[in-house]
Amino acid sequence: MGQETEAVGQMEKLLALFAAERMKSLAAPEVQALVECWKQYITAYHYNCTDEILSALGQMYASDERFAQNIDRFGQGTARFMSGAIAFYCSR
């Protein structure tokens, strides 16, 4: 499996996990651990993901319709939930 295929598979796995957790509190330890996994995923496959970059990405996931639609394929409201969870993570 190539690195790009691996990256897409990992991304989809994480997005599915965000979708599965979307009814939980943004502050729930398992949700915040998932945000940390997302940050590590971006660093491993794309670029060094600082909290500042992560915060900007989180805002974009909910505000940019293209991102929101793609993320919400995993479950309606996942993009907004993910954005909120990232904002909570970055505010600590």
Segments from the language model and where they lie:
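Amphipathic alpha-helical "stalk" segments
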Residues: 1-92
